[in-house]
Amino acid sequence: MIQTCDPPRTLGLRRLSAQEFCTLLQKETSSIYRPHSEVLRMVTVGEVWGLCAPSRQLLAAQPVLPMDADLALAAALRACRGWRGIEGGYFLAPPVGAQDPAQLVAATAARARQLARGRQVLAVLDPGAQQLLPLYLGQGFALRALRPLDSLAPCFVLTAGTATPRREPVWVPLEDRMLLARQLAKGYAALDSRRRDQSIWLGMYPV
């Protein structure tokens, strides 16, 4: 007896309207996406991309935003990284939604690089989304800072395009925030990750 299988149901990517993004944010608790007026400015000055099911149900979304935008998060990043070197660049705000964002982050990272045209690309992650760090490191980002942004809890700040030095890394458990912060303060960046005993460890390199 020959069994037939349905073709795999692929997820689609498309740019979202303000209404679609705001609807998805109704279940989002991150203070990065507050107040509502800030979210509307994000959609106006940047691009919001969504991951959709074949039924067109919206599963996840992520904004791609210019560094020079009149946004609280952009201003906090400029203060964190310094304006020189990131002018004209773009950054990824945290993804939202219940869907695994791997496909979405790959697409938005590529879009940010395209828009930046050789200038700096950054990304921000909420402290509660630490499980996504290996995903970003796999997309060529490096963890460069762990600090508050716009009165938020300490956020992960990542930059793209950091070359991996030819030396052995210092492995730091992600859960040890004090040790991680000390390594970052000494000029190290996390460029690699691995799992040990169900924990995430970051490979830190001097950059």
Where are the regions a protein language model picked out?
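Disulfide-braced loops of extracellular cysteine-rich modules
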Residues: M178-K186
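C-terminal "cap" of GNAT-fold acetyltransferases
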Residues: L149-P173, S199-V207
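Conserved GNAT acetyl-CoA-binding A-motif
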Residues: A112-P127
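Conserved active-site alpha-helix within GNAT-family acetyltransferase domains
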Residues: P127-L146
